[in-house]
Amino acid sequence: MNKRKEKGKSHSKRPVRNTPPRWVPFGPEEIKALIVELSKKGYGPSMIGIILRDQFGVPLVKPIVGKKLVKIMEEQGVAPPIPEDLFHLMKRAVRVRAHLAEHPKDKHSARGLMEIESKIRRLVKYYKRVGKLPPDWKYDPERARLLVQQYSALFESGA
């Protein structure tokens, strides 16, 4: 069952080839250094990928370095404390909760909040299974609000 994925199928295609392109001017060590540098500036993983693509001409990190971008960040000790997709869902849930505090009769937003929080719980279950979150980690709306306040600078479009 495809949950909430009926829209947004249009996107650019990933390069088919798994070998690094010959025209990329950077080697694996230089790309690792760029990733660490950009992470220390406050950029999140997806923003680092966009910057590497648009400003440095690196289409994909994995074929060149041999590891995914987040894996490199984890090895260097600059990875975000919680996965980026989970953080952004929690941020949306916090925003919708704040909206519902002002507009309690907004039933459409209440339903949207239920769907967002269901998706958060599914992601949490997955991240616990793969070991990215501790086994005792639980989603709590108040804790999510505090986490969003604390880590929002890490996942913004940069410092």
Curated annotation (Swiss-Prot):
GO terms for molecular function: small ribosomal subunit rRNA binding; structural constituent of ribosome. Residues 1-22 are annotated as: Disordered. Keywords: Ribonucleoprotein, Ribosomal protein. Residues 1-16 have a biased composition (Basic residues). It comes from the Archaea. One of its GO terms (biological process) is translation. PROSITE patterns: RIBOSOMAL_S15 (PS00362). Gene3D superfamilies: 4.10.860.130, S15/NS1, RNA-binding. One of its GO terms (cellular component) is cytosolic small ribosomal subunit. Belongs to the universal ribosomal protein uS15 family. Part of the 30S ribosomal subunit. This is Small ribosomal subunit protein uS15. It comes from Ignicoccus hospitalis (strain KIN4/I / DSM 18386 / JCM 14125). The lineage of its organism: Archaea, Thermoproteota, Thermoprotei, Desulfurococcales, Desulfurococcaceae. The gene is rps15.
